[in-house]
UniProtKB/Swiss-Prot annotation:
The keyword Magnesium does not apply. Keywords: ATP-binding, Cytoplasm, Kinase, Nucleotide-binding, Transferase. This is Guanylate kinase. It comes from Wolbachia pipientis wMel. Essential for recycling GMP and indirectly, cGMP. ATP binds at S14, P15, S16, G17, A18, G19, K20, T21. PANTHER family: GUANYLATE KINASE (PTHR23117:SF13), GUANYLATE KINASE-RELATED (PTHR23117). Its main location: cytoplasm. It catalyses: GMP + ATP = GDP + ADP. One of its GO terms (cellular component) is cytosol. Signal peptide: none annotated. It is an enzyme of class 2 (transferase).
Length: 201
């Protein structure tokens, strides 16, 4: 007799500079049964990129076919190329008991909440303070002062949406944040086992 459980769709959102990318990388490195969501795109592969690992590379015609068939959870056009989240990749992993990590902004997260709320566990990552966020953005040395101000204004807007998420954490220490999200993921996996057991002879 075997107890089966679906995986969890772990959605992480944060303002730019709050540490979402670093936390995601560490979670994937440390967690078992957790994979990164692989997006689909119509752009050409760059040197070294692997189809199915970095992206699913498809023609624009194929991309639009999948959109019309309802096979894209979310999609957008960026610099003349389309990018989207393929439904099959997410659902196949979840049904196999593998959790999927998706780092997206609040708009993408809210769209997913509408489509598959029961499968989503969402975490909003906050910086310790707006001043700390400003310092982190300045340390990147990739944006000028006006761009940093724009990002900070956008961050305020994003932070105002945090109450719609299942969990909110403050990232003042990367390792502690990774540990906290790992605990959330394990708790939600156990909850799924209790809620939805299916027994096989």
């Amino acid at each position: 007799m075997t107890v089966k459980s679906e995986g969890v769709l772990l959605v992480l959102s944060s303002p730019s500079g709050a540490g979402k990318t670093t936390i995601s990388a560490k979670l994937l490195e440390q967690s078992t049964n957790l994979v990164r969501s692989v997006s689909m795109t119509t752009r050409k592969p760059r040197p070294g990129e692997i189809n199915g690992k970095d992206y699913f590379f498809v023609t624009e015609e194929k991309f639009h076919e999948l959109c019309k068939a309802g096979q894209m959870l979310e999609y957008a056009k960026v610099f003349e190329n389309f990018y989207g989240i393929p439904r099959d990749f997410i659902e196949q992993n979840l049904s196999s008991g593998i959790s999927v990590l998706l780092s997206i902004d609040w708009q993408g997260a809210f769209h997913l909440f509408k489509l598959m709320r029961k499968k989503v566990v969402s975490v909003f990552i906050l910086p310790p303070s707006m001043e700390e966020l400003r310092l982190r953005l300045q340390k990147r040395n990739s944006d000028d002062a006006s761009e940093i101000e724009r990002r900070l204004a956008e961050a305020q807007k994003e932070i105002s949406k945090r109450d719609k998420y299942d969990y909110v954490i403050i990232n003042d220490d990367i390792d502690k944040s990774v540990e906290e999200i790992s605990s959330i993921l394990n708790k939600e996996r156990l909850k799924k086992l209790k809620e939805k057991p299916s027994l096989e002879d």
